Amino acid sequence: MIISAASDYRAAAQRTLPPFLFHYIDGGAYAEYTLRRNVEDLSQVALRQRVLKNMSDLSLETTLFNETLSMPVALAPVGLCGMYARRGEVQAAAAADAKGIPFTLSTVSVCPIEEVAPTIQRPMWFQLYVLRDRGFMRNALERAKAAGCSTLVFTVDMPTPGARYRDAHSGMSGPNAAMRRYWQAVMHPKWAWDVGLNGRPHDLGNISAYLGKPTGLEDYIGWLANNFDPSISWKDLEWIREFWDGPMVIKGLLDPEDARDAVRFGADGIVVSNHGGRQLDGVLSSARALPAIADAVKGDIAILADSGIRNGLDVVRMIALGADTVLLGRAYLYALATAGKAGVANLLDLIEKEMKVAMTLTGAKTISEISGDSLVQELGKSLPAALAPMSKGDAA
């Protein structure tokens, strides 16, 4: 199979993975309107082509939280990553490390902090939810700090799990889910051998280490359902600051006022994100929400963005809309499921090449030169026409 883009990895992953795993990462909440708009809105952002600019000394390098990145991309936290490839978190982290970008380990990873951190040279980032079990949160923070994690990514848009209808149809949840998953695995022998058998243990490593006992997929679903905390508030972040003195990034903001609150709190960064369309369907796409947030807090706090990014051109678009760096989620999971570490490494190379083409043809020699001036404006509007707020007629 010829791999020339992230979409090729998606097609390959769909053939390789049991349906319950493919649709778990591929799907979104409810009717998946926001999931689709994340990609569609970003694809409509028109770049301003510039020529004869002598682009021979182009550089993608950037600095974030006193770390040098080879390009403004980090791998996002993704739960169950180790179910998509044998010890998947270790493989993905190795690819990111070799590329010179951060890898973010999820709270609900298969491989625990202590397994992943020693395998890479670059300090990894760690993602944490607000959970009812504050003892687990404190334990996770202490372990992340002991393992040398440099940055905490604190996810705030999940006080309760989103309703993902596709999961019930695919076997991730719903009637007879365990039996359905078993037969799907049997029908996908490559995955069953490489991951199902040889990728064990299939614990949620960070949780197992705290509870002192193995936790399987059913435990994952049950534990999360019982532990997400709808009482989350800024006081919880103040509590976390007692145990974490490194950079803290608040993930899951879509409103400028929430971004201003993050600045007032003293966060080091925010992630403009709708959780990849997996939480509340019908909210703004990240691309549509980003410009107003950038107008409100650009320069006061680091702005990261995710949701809908599929290639290097999308990275440039997000930066032009106001992001400093992006997080890559689904795209790297498809590559990981297809070819492990080599797949993720190749995807990152493709993104780098696509970014260089986009920057060369928009006249931006450095990441700092990508801005709103890189976008095509219409009638003097401050937003690209495709992302301007909908009128009442459009909304109807």
UniProtKB/Swiss-Prot annotation:
One annotated GO biological process: aerobic respiration
GO molecular function annotation: FMN binding; L-lactate dehydrogenase activity
Entry's localization field: Cell inner membrane
Cellular compartments per GO CC: plasma membrane
Keyword Cell inner membrane: yes
Reactions listed under catalytic activity: (S)-lactate + A = pyruvate + AH2
Protein task: Catalyzes the conversion of L-lactate to pyruvate. Is coupled to the respiratory chain.
Name recorded for this polypeptide: L-lactate dehydrogenase
Species in which this protein is naturally found: Salmonella paratyphi C (strain RKS4594)
Lineage of origin: Bacteria, Pseudomonadati, Pseudomonadota, Gammaproteobacteria, Enterobacterales
